Amino acid sequence: GFGTILKALAKIAGKVVKKLATKPGATYMLKENLK
């Protein structure tokens, strides 16, 4: 169902965020993407 898709996307997003968090400027990039 749709909920399963959202959970899968959340897991992927979490992994991406963790990878970006180790790089300088990641916070700035995330803020820009959320605008």
From Swiss-Prot:
On whether Transferase is a keyword of this UniProt record, the answer is: no
Q: Which domain of life is it from?
A: Eukaryota
Keywords (A to Z) from UniProt: Amidation, Secreted, Toxin
Which Gene Ontology cellular-component terms appear in the entry? Answer: extracellular region
Record PTM Lysine amide, positions in chain: K35
Q: In which tissues is it expressed?
A: Expressed by the venom gland.
Q: Which GO terms describe its molecular function?
A: toxin activity
Report the subcellular localization.
Secreted
> Is Secreted given among the entry's keywords?
yes
Describe the family membership recorded for this protein in Swiss-Prot or TrEMBL: Belongs to the cationic peptide 04 (cupiennin) family. 02 subfamily.
Under which name does UniProt file this protein? Cupiennin-2a
